[in-house]
Amino acid sequence: MPKEALELLRLPQGGTAVDGTLGLAGHSLLMAQALGPQGHLIGIDRDNASLGQAKIKLASVDLKIDCPLPPGSQQGGMNPNLDKNCSRIHLLQGSFSELDKILASLKVSAVDGILLDLGISSFQLDDEARGFAFRFEGPLDMRMDPSQGVSAADLVNTLKEVQLEKIIWEFGEERFARRIAAAIVMQRAKAKITTTKMLADTVLRALPKGYTRGRIHPATRTFQALRIEVNQELEVLAQGLDVCFKSLKEGGRLCVISFHSLEDRLVKNKFKSLGFEEDGLVLTKRPLVATDEECADNPRSRSAKMRVIERIR
């Protein structure tokens, strides 16, 4: 939904914007082009490997990358008297939940637009060494930042059965969470679950035979639940929505693309409260969804929902 996102963000020429989930810079490339040669783009990602790939992609834009950004004005724009050698794109590792600190470190007071494309990128899914996907056999990791936190293997091999059930039920919305948690505990008593295939096979054995005939792989919800827990995705999102909204200048917009009901519900409720209690105007009364054509080109987009809010004061 890149076209719709750019239209709703309404980035001004020469403005300043943030891609809070940089990934492979698909959205960032379009944002940089919309901002023009005098604009500034800040790209953030928790995954350092994504930053390297994004830098390669953004090299096609006629904008310098990775020099320190200059101080911002009180209105959130950049100093109009910039040195012509200064960067227009700044990429850094971090989380959008800490955007206030990131902007402060760059001496940027506020921005014109922020995009959050939640979930996991194809780049991460397709790397078997990262352990996000069950279609490959790889280490059961799932960390967006491999240098921090516990892995999915740590969770499935150490948590109590009741804790695993809670995670799989709440974050995966998996109705057979109890059976799956019991199967995990039984399997790890025989041998530690260390690979994606071991976990997927364990889940399959726990499920009724008829349950394996659905549209999605039977292990999808369990993998989603563990990934959300490993990366604290909902906590990061809840904190990040507040931080991002407060980082907008007057008239600035925050666009969020979510991929499952837990994320979308959180975004919907937060935007609603920002509209009532803060200076927010929700621009999408109903979430925008991908067109049939886009779903055909990118099957992952079939579950995407986009919501946008504007800071009006």
Regions found by a protein language model. Give the residues of each.
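S-adenosyl-L-methionine-dependent methyltransferase catalytic core, i.e., the SAM/SAH-binding region
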Residues: M1-C67, N79-R313
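Short Gly/Ser/Thr- and charged-rich N-terminal loops/segments
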Residues: P71-G77
